[in-house]
Every structure is written in C-alpha cells, then in structure tokens.
Amino acid sequence: MFTDTINKCAANAARIARLSANNPLGFWVSSAMAGAYVGLGIILIFTLGNLLDPSVRPLVMGATFGIALTLVIIAGSELFTGHTMFLTFGVKAGSISHGQMWAILPQTWLGNLVGSVFVAMLYSWGGGSLLPVDTSIVHSVALAKTTAPAMVLFFKGALCNWLVCLAIWMALRTEGAAKFIAIWWCLLAFIASGYEHSIANMTLFALSWFGNHSEAYTLAGIGHNLLWVTLGNTLSGAVFMGLGYWYATPKANRPVADKFNQTETAAG
C-alpha cells in the first residue's frame, strides 16, 4: 500500500546524499533556495495578516501560505523539514547510512538559514513596509515565539512538521491538481493552528531583527525557539512519518537494501 511511496522517498534520500557528496556547492545553493522560498511565503502571509482583523487573520494567512511548499516541491529545493522524513526512509531502506543522514541534516538546516536571512535582507533593503512600525504583527509574533516555553515550542514543532511531511507525502501519492490541494490543506492547518516551523521562523526572526523590534527581542530568544522547534520538527518527520509509515507497511512489502541498491544502479 505504501511501498511505492517509500521507494520514492528512499530514492530521493539517495539523490540528496549524492548531491551533497558530489556537488556540495549545488547542495548548499539548493538548500538556500528552500529557505528563500519559505521566506517568500512568510512575507506574503504577514503582509496580508497585518491588514486584517485578528478574528480572520489565521484563516487568511493559512490559506495563502501554500505558496511556500509549492515553490519548494514544484521548483525543487532542499528543505530541512522534508529531509527529516526522506532521510529516515533512506536509512531504513538502505539507500543511505546513518552517518550520511546526520551529516546532511545540519547542512540543510544551515543552508535554509542562509536563504531565509537573504530574503529578509532583500525585503528590508526594498523598503520592508512591515519592519519600521513597532506595532506590526511581525514584531509581536516574533517576540511571542522567542519567549514561549520550551515544551510548547517542541510539541508545536512536532505537530507542524507532521502536517508539512504529510503534505509532501500526499504530493508523492497524487497527480495533477491533487498535489496542490494536499499542500494547501496541510499548510492551512499548520498556520491557522499556530504551529511552529523552524525554517519559516528563520525568515520571521530575521525580518523582525532588521526592523523596529522590542528590546526584549534577543538573539538568545531566537536560539531558544529554533532549538526546540527544530527538535520537534525532527521528531515528527523522522518518527511519526518516516518510522510510522515504514512500520505501517507489512515487512514483506518493505524495500530491501540489496534490491533497492540494485534498482538504483540499474537506473544509473
């Protein structure tokens, strides 16, 4: 039932590992692109959200954030939160090693950070209408995120990436417009519910940092948020999705390392 999708994920993990090993610059550029694409979505939804009544703000922001993951998937790029799922399948299927997984994940995260900050810088240099006004929701939301309790951030991070990886998983299992509908629904649920995505937060934090933020907004607070949200994102991508669907697949139908590697070799 899930074998074909797991094979796609494991094959993508092998592709990611090859790109990282054979073309490190290309891997970092592609990772930066993912951070930038998510950042463009963040700028969009906060621009709209800043104009709206709080009662409808979560719905509208959630309904328009689908552009972020659509760009990542359709244009192609390396997103940390998706990699937590892909690389887990790769390890279980034998297409990559544990060592490769733990070497690639931090590189992807840092590449995403570069792209996220770059987009925020461009927005700031371009006038950044959200940034000079201290009452902008960019500043209030960023501050609230950096002062939230660790366990709140951790579990909101877990719920968030469960939805993000479900969007990616369903996009792999569908064709045509169904891909976009799957992405749209999952990201609507993530944003409207107020969950935490480490890469999306990177651009938000950079935007507030470049603007007229409160003195209570600190680098330590940003680090606090990104640490716990990243851990929560990793839990759901690797365990809820990667291990979850691996063990939901009957053992006889799971990819076997030798067979998978033979398929990869035959495919070039």
UniProtKB/Swiss-Prot annotation:
<keyword id="KW-0472">Membrane</keyword>
<feature type="topological domain" description="Cytoplasmic">
    <location>
        <begin position="173"/>
        <end position="179"/>
    </location>
</feature>
<feature type="transmembrane region" description="Helical">
    <location>
        <begin position="26"/>
        <end position="46"/>
    </location>
</feature>
<dbReference type="Pfam" id="PF01226">
    <property type="entry name" value="Form_Nir_trans"/>
</dbReference>
<keyword id="KW-0813">Transport</keyword>
<dbReference type="InterPro" id="IPR024002">
    <property type="entry name" value="For/NO2_transpt_CS"/>
</dbReference>
<feature type="topological domain" description="Cytoplasmic">
    <location>
        <begin position="247"/>
        <end position="268"/>
    </location>
</feature>
<keyword id="KW-0997">Cell inner membrane</keyword>
<feature type="topological domain" description="Periplasmic">
    <location>
        <begin position="134"/>
        <end position="151"/>
    </location>
</feature>
<feature type="transmembrane region" description="Helical">
    <location>
        <begin position="60"/>
        <end position="80"/>
    </location>
</feature>
<dbReference type="GO" id="GO:0042128">
    <property type="term" value="P:nitrate assimilation"/>
</dbReference>
<keyword id="KW-0812">Transmembrane</keyword>
<protein>
    <recommendedName>
        <fullName>Nitrite transporter NirC</fullName>
    </recommendedName>
</protein>
<dbReference type="GO" id="GO:0005886">
    <property type="term" value="C:plasma membrane"/>
</dbReference>
<dbReference type="GO" id="GO:0015724">
    <property type="term" value="P:formate transport"/>
</dbReference>
<dbReference type="GO" id="GO:0015113">
    <property type="term" value="F:nitrite transmembrane transporter activity"/>
</dbReference>
<feature type="transmembrane region" description="Helical">
    <location>
        <begin position="113"/>
        <end position="133"/>
    </location>
</feature>
<comment type="function">
    <text>Catalyzes nitrite uptake and nitrite export across the cytoplasmic membrane. Is up to 10-fold more active than NarK or NarU in nitrite uptake for subsequent reduction in the cytoplasm by the NirB/NirD nitrite reductase.</text>
</comment>
<feature type="transmembrane region" description="Helical">
    <location>
        <begin position="180"/>
        <end position="200"/>
    </location>
</feature>
<feature type="topological domain" description="Periplasmic">
    <location>
        <begin position="47"/>
        <end position="59"/>
    </location>
</feature>
<dbReference type="InterPro" id="IPR000292">
    <property type="entry name" value="For/NO2_transpt"/>
</dbReference>
<feature type="topological domain" description="Periplasmic">
    <location>
        <begin position="201"/>
        <end position="225"/>
    </location>
</feature>
<keyword id="KW-1003">Cell membrane</keyword>
<comment type="similarity">
    <text>Belongs to the FNT transporter (TC 1.A.16) family.</text>
</comment>
<keyword id="KW-1133">Transmembrane helix</keyword>
<keyword id="KW-0534">Nitrate assimilation</keyword>
<feature type="transmembrane region" description="Helical">
    <location>
        <begin position="226"/>
        <end position="246"/>
    </location>
</feature>
<dbReference type="GO" id="GO:0015707">
    <property type="term" value="P:nitrite transport"/>
</dbReference>
<dbReference type="InterPro" id="IPR023271">
    <property type="entry name" value="Aquaporin-like"/>
</dbReference>
<dbReference type="GO" id="GO:0015499">
    <property type="term" value="F:formate transmembrane transporter activity"/>
</dbReference>
<feature type="topological domain" description="Cytoplasmic">
    <location>
        <begin position="81"/>
        <end position="112"/>
    </location>
</feature>
<feature type="transmembrane region" description="Helical">
    <location>
        <begin position="152"/>
        <end position="172"/>
    </location>
</feature>
<feature type="topological domain" description="Cytoplasmic">
    <location>
        <begin position="1"/>
        <end position="25"/>
    </location>
</feature>
